[in-house]
Amino acid sequence: MSQAPLVLVDGSSYLYRAFHALPPLTTSTGKPTGAVKGVLNMLLSLRKQYPDSPFAVVFDAKGPTFRDELFAEYKANRPSMPDDLRVQVEPLHASVRALGLPLLCVEGVEADDVIGTLARSSAAADRPVVISTGDKDMAQLVDGHITLVNTMTGSRLDVDGVKEKFGVGPELIIDFLALMGDKVDNIPGVPGVGEKTALGLLTGVGGGLEVLYASLDKVPELPIRGAKGLPAKLEENREQAFLSYQLATIKTDVELDVEIDKLYPGEPQREALIALYRELEFKNWLDDLLREAKEAGENGEAETPIQAEVDYDVVLDQAGFDAWLKKLEEAELIAFDTETTSIDAQQAQVVGVSFAVKEGEAAYVPLAHSYMGVPEQLDRDAVLRALKPLLEDPKKLKVGQHAKYDINVLANASTPIALRGVAYDTMLESYVLDSTATRHDMDSLALKYLGHSTIRFEDIAGKGAKQLTFDQIAIEQAGPYAAEDADVTLRLHQALWQKLEAIPSLARVLTDIEMPLVPVLARIERNGALVDANLLGIQSRELGEKMVALERQAYDLAGQEFNLGSPKQLGAILYDKLGLPVLSKTATGQPSTAEAVLAELAEQDFELPKVIMQYRSMSKLKSTYTDRLPEQINPRTGRIHTSYHQAVAATGRLSSSDPNLQNIPIRTAEGRRIRQAFVAPQGYKLLAADYSQIELRIMAHLAKDDGLLDAFRHDLDVHRATAAEVFGVPLEDVSGDQRRSAKAINFGLIYGMSAFGLAKQIGVERKEAQAYIDRYFARYPGVLAYMERTRAQAAEQGFVETLFGRRLYLPEIHSKNGAMRKAAERTAINAPMQGTAADIMKRAMVAVDNWLQESGLDARVILQVHDELVLEVREDLVEQVCEGIRPLMSGAATLDVPLVVEAGVGSNWDEAH
């Protein structure tokens, strides 16, 4: 039986490659971790491939090597290690050691030399060797025993592979490198000899440097460009060529106090890994480790308060339920959760309910489990009737995790319950505390704030097509899972609320904005929107016909048929066949066919990219809306019930899904037609109330700029007013083009647009765009002062705030990476405006909902999109409702300029604009 190969990993090479090739991940405090994660992923993959192999991860040691003594300029061109990479070296070394993998660093030589020595030693003992590297220098080591693998690309090089890739065998790789040199390592080589010339010389004379220099008289006859002048050039640089040979040669005789048989990996140090993964915020790996520790019955770092003894009840009889009902009535705060048949709250059926009243004391009441041999359960409606007074009592405080879902489930239950008194929601507590620090699901929060790995749904229900619904799960498994949900929710609230109370402005955002909004959003979701499925069917057919016509047009332009949805085929047509300029490449080095690239090509008047963009736009509308919306109609209500998400957008904005209303195009005819399919029922109208230029008004308020304040206070067309200032013309003489340019400047500056971006948008030279921006700031100095002030505050504090105290943390504001830092600065300027607009809309939604509930009017909010509320109103009440909601929306905040609300009415959503 053959021996398992020795696996040698070029750690230094992969560290650099991972840093430059992978996304720049950071922790919630801004600590870079992307390179660490990339290298660890690669190591774990290699260990799976070679489970029985001795293994060593080799890194360059600090300090000079023998090559620096040979040539003082060695690696002089290489820039110093970036700070964001330097800080990842120690955590990576610590993680490698904690994984039980042998790690080698030898002073005076490079990692290549250590790898070369171990590889040759192992090969001499007839053991195969696998070197994992992306470094071309290593090709010189390849022989019958030694193979190279590049884990990042999946490529493998044996002797034949080296010949195919480089044109010479492993025995000539050093000579090849010596002739052509290496700019990265500053190996000089022979000036004027590149890859093709070096290859021609070595193959032409049939040997390496020694043979070449003994055969200079044959060089002029070789079929190489400039061959006649090469002998003189080679002779002149003879010493440099042989120096380069020495520099490029990997040592294979380094004195190492290492025995190959001692390089077998040891057991991972679980506690050390848990501590490291916590620090690096590697959530999934940490979760797996904690779960393993729990299953193994280990404590130490893996121990959490929840792993201590808990008292979880599964309530199957009336006496047990009565006892828990008494506990709930006596508790100051109840954590609750529902278990159901579906993640769709509008279709889910209650399977059970769980509660916790103090840490470790929780219960699950199964109500509708259904499988062979299921124990007898309490009657669902009887239990819900008994819980109804408690759950509907607004004075009985409750905490949930994503409570909006439970509110809707209980409202739709066979015994409907109007859940009130939900004072806290751990998802929203985490979101308000720091919207970007972590995901806000319970599993992630438990891991982050409690150090606890929860029972996952997949653990009890399975995965994929065979996954059980909750009613099919055995009560013995369902009980601990459901009771833990309630217990963890209570513990999370205690941890998170303490942090929020320490920052009163954030506590107010939770209690005054986010929590009052929860029942409002739940009601909007239940209300749903009526859509005309027949009209959507007609639109779908029409879009399909237009797509067929665009396909034909694309085939004509390409001169052949191809799959318009295939980036590979499209790339071949655009770049190989039509010869369009390559503006950008993908991560794999292929010419990009991304939307932004096609848009740029279309701007250069290339026809095919224009057609492809039109085709893609229509394809997306068809698949996402005209085909999909009819499928999303709830069979019980006949309406579409979108889901609103409070804890997704970093700035505080709401987002939506199933369907995503935010992405319906506003300006295209096709997008407007989709809005026409959102209709009012007979006897009703749709009322759309929209904030006018809310972010610009907030900018005027924040910047305190007299010019902008004056324009809004006098109800001027702010874009026309800006155009008059920037272009130096009277207000009445502003042209349409000037107004459009001014609008681009107004909105562009909010989003941190550069002169380059503005020039592209309005079709002028960059210098001209910069002149417009300069004139803008000269006319509106308050805006420039606000931007500079905000950048400085963000850098000092690490966060920015809305008018209502919501924070957006910006860990990249101190990044050494200039692009990331600039992006954080742009976010710092925009986030207070976008976040304040979000806060105002949320406050308005609560005010409007309260008024509608108190008034008893036959009107309801059915949609919230961007800065707009859409209501369904009985026809004879339209004027009354319009007059009622306008002051509520405009009064949602007090600014230095008026908050203007524009309203429209129609039989469908498009008509209401």
From Swiss-Prot:
This protein's gene is called polA
Task: Identify the residues that the record assigns to the 3'-5' exonuclease domain, covering every copy.
Answer: 306-501
- Can you state which reaction this protein catalyses? DNA(n) + a 2'-deoxyribonucleoside 5'-triphosphate = DNA(n+1) + diphosphate
- What GO MF terms are annotated? 3'-5' exonuclease activity; 5'-3' exonuclease activity; DNA binding; DNA-directed DNA polymerase activity
Keywords annotated in UniProt: DNA damage, DNA repair, DNA replication, DNA-binding, DNA-directed DNA polymerase, Exonuclease, Hydrolase, Nuclease, Nucleotidyltransferase, Transferase
Q: Which CDD domains match?
A: DNA_pol_A_pol_I_C (cd08637), DNA_polA_I_Ecoli_like_exo (cd06139), H3TH_53EXO (cd09898), PIN_53EXO (cd09859)
Question: Which of the seven top EC classes does this enzyme belong to?
Answer: transferase
Q: Where do the segments described as Polymerase lie? A: 505-913
Q: What is this protein called?
A: DNA polymerase I
Q: Name one GO biological process term.
A: DNA-templated DNA replication
- Cited InterPro entries: 3'-5'_exonuclease_dom, 5-3_exonucl_a-hlix_arch_N, 5-3_exonuclease, 5-3_exonuclease_C_sf, DNA-dir_DNA_pol_A_CS, DNA-dir_DNA_pol_A_palm_dom, DNA/RNA_pol_sf, DNA_polI_H3TH
Which superkingdom? Bacteria
Locate the coiled-coil region(s) and give their ranges: none
Q: Which PROSITE patterns match?
A: DNA_POLYMERASE_A
Please report the stretch or stretches of sequence annotated as the 5'-3' exonuclease domain.
1-305
What EC numbers are recorded for this enzyme?
A: 2.7.7.7
The cross-references to SUPFAM superfamilies, in alphabetical order and at most eight, read: 5' to 3' exonuclease, C-terminal subdomain (SSF47807), DNA/RNA polymerases (SSF56672), PIN domain-like (SSF88723), Ribonuclease H-like (SSF53098)
- NCBIfam families reported for this sequence: pola, PRK05755.1
**Free-text function comment from the UniProt entry:** In addition to polymerase activity, this DNA polymerase exhibits 3'-5' and 5'-3' exonuclease activity.
Subunit structure, briefly? Answer: Single-chain monomer with multiple functions.
Q: Which family does it belong to?
A: Belongs to the DNA polymerase type-A family.
